[in-house]
Design a protein with these regions (language model features):
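GHKL-family ATPase ATP-binding module
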Residues: 1-14, 21, 45, 53-55, ...
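Conserved short strand/loop->alpha-helix "switch" segment adjacent to the catalytic nucleotide/phosphoryl-transfer site
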Residues: 26-45
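C-terminal interaction appendages of subunits in large macromolecular complexes
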Residues: 390-409, 424-429, 440, 444-446, ...
Length: 646
């Protein structure tokens, strides 16, 4: 950040209050997206974003996040401290304005903050409104100030409670149980993922996460310290840790073009996937936007120019496409924009046109320098591009074959599909069932009006290790495309999934509750993530939860999904109940499968969502890729959460 910003006076005059808070408690989803798990965690992100803004302005380098024993959260930074002097317009302390007025804060004042994070931009006041209790403590000008709030309303005026040599702001809040009715339990892993991401995006900042709900064997609380010296370069290494690189270095740069700071880091690996993650002011822009457009333009033009000059493309009999330059690419783009305009379905697509050219120029300069200085790597990249073009040509033919077999192409449905009679896709669901025998039981137990069954023969192809044309040639995968009625464009610019003719709005993976079943579920999820991501993002993918046990005594019976439920059911029946352990779906008869796993009134379905594309990509490449040590480490760390049937 510039020295000019650091020198500016950050006081009550810097705080602008835009509107009142009346709406927040009535319509919380308008402000934080939802009141489920995602919205609950978003409260933490809003408070942390304030501290990150202080860091971006050059006034803070340490942030602490603590999950307390009662699931309240404390966020502390060593910034300047929120101003506490009287706000001229509002007539109360600036701290109270920040905490009780939506949109109030220095981030709307360009002199105090050049750029600011926070997707919704609602700030800590929204967190305050949605909290049962919040306490703000400010360390500023040698004094300690405090104010507490209940459901967004101050309990007393800001008061001085002591003196100090430190500076910064500490906010402790407890979410309101009348608003967050689904859960108040914070996920350590979810918060850790976001804090790690923020540390990579803002190098030099130290973010500490502590979970006081869990104590380690040595007596310390569970926790991690996130600090990155190399920023995006380190981020790429972290994401690509389970893939084999084909070039010697991560290519990276930091640039400021036309007052738009641009950071890029990229590497090529042996995989066939393109993984580009884009950020604006620390917000993950899932839907891309103008910064991604600029990156692709700069990358394609520069590599095409080099490849043409090298003469390596002369023997190729067809045109190179933009996609060919991005196969096996992992890249991160981060830009800072003063007034970002967000578009798209989830408001995570950058719309600022002025961003395209600076990003494109910065990427072009970075790549030109690297290719010139590293001729061996340059040749390897071009050879990778040629192989990608040849594979794309073969995959296009395979995709066209899939298109001809889909309903859109006039072909028939897969012979193994037992369809439903309902014609409205919104009311229809299809079960992807492991094995023909379980598929037979599911066909007998289903409600034929709205439930379809597609049996899958054994383990489907591991798409993480397969070239794209091999994926489209696989019969089981072609059957899934055909049954769902979805298509992938055969032209390279329109490879996005077309969900307009999706035949079922619920796609349910139903596998055995054992290790093999989990493996098959993971293979199917990997396929969906790599080739039908829109299906997951649209909320259409679910995993069925068949029970592990039947507990029976006389005429009484209960199903149990874990050991605790099994033991409680046995106790309720007076002990000595007969316990049957289901090793597979085939062990249940049609009636049992219906009442436990398929009846909408009683079944449990787990909806598959993606909180972080970058983290999901890393986990899928680790679980399904070639590198064994990271996979072993992940399994050992998470084995405690798994039920393994020996």
């Amino acid at each position: 950040m510039s020295d000019e910003i650091k020198k500016n006076n950050y006081s009550a005059d810097s705080i602008q209050a835009l509107e009142g808070m009346e709406h927040v408690r009535m319509r919380p989803s308008m402000y934080i997206g939802d009141t489920g798990v995602r919205g609950l965690h978003h409260l933490v992100y809003e408070v942390v974003d304030n501290s990150i803004d202080e860091a971006l302005a050059g006034h803070c380098d340490t942030i602490s996040v603590i999950i307390n024993e009662d699931n309240s959260v404390t966020v502390e930074d060593n910034g300047r401290g929120i101003p506490v002097d009287i706000h001229k317009k509002e007539g109360v302390s600036a701290l109270e304005v920040v905490m009780t007025k939506i949109g109030a804060g220095g981030k709307f004042d360009k002199d105090s903050y050049k750029v600011s994070g926070g997707l919704h931009g609602v700030g800590v006041s929204c967190v305050n409104a949605l909290s049962d209790h919040l306490r703000a403590t400010v360390f500023r000008d040698g004094k300690i100030y405090e104010q507490e709030y209940e459901r967004g309303k101050s309990m007393y005026p800001v008061k001085q409670i002591g003196e100090t040599t430190k500076r910064g702001t500490t906010v402790t809040f407890k979410p309101d149980s009348t608003i967050f009715t689904q859960t108040l339990e914070y996920s350590y892993d979810t918060l850790a993922g976001r804090m790690r991401e923020l540390s990579f995006l803002n190098k030099g900042i130290t973010i500490t996460l502590t979970d006081r709900r869990h104590t380690k064997d040595n007596g310390d609380f569970e926790g991690e310290v996130f600090h990155s010296k190399e920023g995006l370069k380190e981020f790429v290494k972290f994401l690509d840790g389970n893939r084999v690189p084909i070039i010697s270095h991560v290519i990276s740069m930091e640039h400021e073009k036309g007052e738009i700071p641009v950071e890029v880091a990229l590497i090529y690996n042996e995989s066939y996937a393109e993984n580009i993650f884009s950020y604006v002011n620390n917000i993950n822009t899932h839907e891309g936007g103008t910064h991604l457009q600029g990156f692709r333009m700069g990358l394609t033009r520069t590599l095409k120019k080099y490849a043409d000059a090298s003469g390596l493309l002369e023997k190729l009999k067809f045109e190179i496409s933009g996609d060919d330059f991005r196969e096996g690419l992992t890249a991160i783009i981060s830009v800072k924009v003063q007034e970002p305009q967000f578009e798209g379905q989830t408001k995570t697509k950058l719309g600022n046109r002025e961003v395209v050219s600076p990003v494109s120029q910065a990427v072009a300069e970075m790549l030109e320098n690297y290719l010139e200085e590293n001729p061996n790597d340059a040749k390897i990249i071009v050879q990778k591009v040629i192989l990608a073009a040849q594979a794309r040509h073969a995959a296009k033919k395979a995709r066209e074959m899939v298109q001809r077999k889909t309903v859109l192409g006039g072909g028939g449905l897969p012979g193994k599909l037992s369809d439903c009679s309902e014609q409205d896709p919104a009311k229809c669901e299809v079960y992807l069932v492991e094995g023909d025998s379980a598929g037979g039981t599911a066909k007998q137990g289903r409600d034929r009006n709205f439930q379809a069954i597609l049996p899958l023969r054994g383990k489907i192809l591991n798409v993480e290790k397969a070239m794209h044309h091999k994926v489209f040639e696989n019969e089981e995968i072609r059957n899934i495309f055909t049954a769902l009625g979805v298509t992938i464009g055969t032209e390279e610019d329109s490879k996005a999934l077309n969900l307009e003719k999706l035949r079922y709005h619920k796609v349910i993976i139903m596998c055995d509750a054992d290790v093999d079943g989990s493996h098959i579920s993971t293979l199917i999820l990997t396929f969906f993530f790599r080739f039908m991501k829109e299906l997951i993002e649209g909320g259409h993918v679910y995993i069925a939860a068949p029970p592990l046990y039947l507990v029976k005594k006389g005429n009484k019976k209960e199903y149990a999904w874990n050991d605790d439920q099994r033991d409680l059911a046995n106790e309720r029946m007076g002990g000595s109940a007969a316990i049957q352990r289901y090793k597979g779906l085939g062990e249940m008869n049609a009636e049992q499968l219906w009442e436990t796993t398929m009846d909408p009134e009683f079944r449990t379905l787990r909806q598959v969502t993606i909180d972080s594309l970058a983290e999901a990509d890393r986990v899928f490449s680790m679980l399904m890729g070639d590198e064994v040590p990271p996979r072993r480490e992940f399994i050992e760390k998470n084995a405690v959460y798994a039920k393994i049937d020996a």
